[in-house]
Regions:
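Terminal, compositionally biased segments used for targeting/anchoring and flexible tails
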Residues: 1-92
Length: 92
């Protein structure tokens, strides 16, 4: 749940290039999923980028496994939002 460096951030792209959004935390990533172009989500999910970033940058193997293959924007948002709420609750 920490804030990431620019090098660690998730940079949203599409087949034609960067789409102008970068997430510097899991919270911000979930918020940006609501507004990034749908083709960006599809692009990253087809390549496995989201699961890879979650596993290797955020070190959350469970969430990475859960998001693998999910193509529906709302399902991704719901799953990630539930996970981040659980993680925040453990810090309180």
């Amino acid at each position: 749940l920490r804030t990431l460096t620019p090098e660690e951030a998730f940079h949203f792209a599409s087949p034609s290039g960067h789409v102008g959004y970068a997430a510097y935390s899991l919270d911000q990533f979930c918020d940006l999923l609501r507004v990034v172009p749908a083709d960006s989500i599809t692009y990253h999910q087809e390549r496995g980028d989201i699961a890879h970033w979650i596993e290797h940058t955020l070190f959350d193997q469970k969430l990475a496994a859960d998001v693998t293959g999910l193509m529906d924007r709302q399902e991704l948002i719901t799953l990630i939002d539930e996970r981040r709420q659980l993680l925040w609750s453990r810090l309180q």
